[in-house]
Amino acid sequence: MAIPVVGLTGGIGSGKSAAADRFAELGVPVIDTDSIAHQLTGPGGAAMTEIVRVFGPGVVAGDGSLDRAAMRARVFAAPEERKRLEAILHPAIHAESVRRLQAAVGDYAVLVVPLLFESDRYAPLLARALVVDCSEEVQVERVMRRSKLSADAVRAIMAAQLPRSERLRRADDVIDNSGGLAELRLQVDAKHSYYLANLVKAML
């Protein structure tokens, strides 16, 4: 990469998006793989032709985007379908992430990858891995508050992700988001100063 890249991750409800938003406010280029995935599967998205070829027109919404409810039902009924979908999306998301990182202008960039440690695909791109962390109880509470999911449903999603202890073990840097937004922003500001002083200096 032309500039250093910080990989930003964390469990569901940890506050990844709020942290990414603050980095963006500080002028850091932020590339979000979830956003890329939505663009690839939106109306006219680059992945839709292959998705239709593999899964048929039944997974396409009226506007030409991926019908997420229909795809979720397919994946739930037959787990091997998830692998077929991932085989289409993951390489495309990675390629677009690399393209955007190479075009990024700034002292360093942040790459938001919810499942950063579940795959080794992104590791070669990164100078640092930053985990936004909070207790599992706080995760459940936050996700329930912002969605209609039950506590059991949230815990099922968490169980499919890397355990919190393993994320923390693999992190280079950690932001503790057990408090409020103001505290999170202060921690992001501190990390930003650290990255400017260390990552950027290392590139000179």
From Swiss-Prot:
The record lists the organism as Chromobacterium violaceum (strain ATCC 12472 / DSM 30191 / JCM 1249 / CCUG 213 / NBRC 12614 / NCIMB 9131 / NCTC 9757 / MK)
What range does the record give for the signal peptide? none
Q: Where is this protein localized, as stated in its record? A: Cytoplasm
User: What reactions does this protein catalyze?
Assistant: 3'-dephospho-CoA + ATP = ADP + CoA + H(+)
Q: Which gene encodes it?
A: coaE
Which keywords appear in this protein's UniProt record, sorted alphabetically?
Answer: ATP-binding, Coenzyme A biosynthesis, Cytoplasm, Kinase, Nucleotide-binding, Transferase
What protein family does this chain belong to? Belongs to the CoaE family.
- Where is the organism placed in the taxonomic lineage, from the top? Bacteria, Pseudomonadati, Pseudomonadota, Betaproteobacteria, Neisseriales
**Where is it mainly found?**
cytoplasm
* One example GO MF annotation: ATP binding
Short name of one Pfam family: CoaE
Q: Which residues form the DPCK domain?
A: 5-204
Q: Which residues bind ATP?
A: 13-18
Which pathway is it part of? Cofactor biosynthesis; coenzyme A biosynthesis; CoA from (R)-pantothenate: step 5/5
Q: List its EC numbers.
A: 2.7.1.24
What this chain does, per the entry, is described as: Catalyzes the phosphorylation of the 3'-hydroxyl group of dephosphocoenzyme A to form coenzyme A.
What is the recorded name of this protein?
A: Dephospho-CoA kinase
Fetch the CDD domains from UniProt: DPCK
Please give an example of a GO cellular component term from this record: cytoplasm
Q: Name one GO biological process term.
A: coenzyme A biosynthetic process
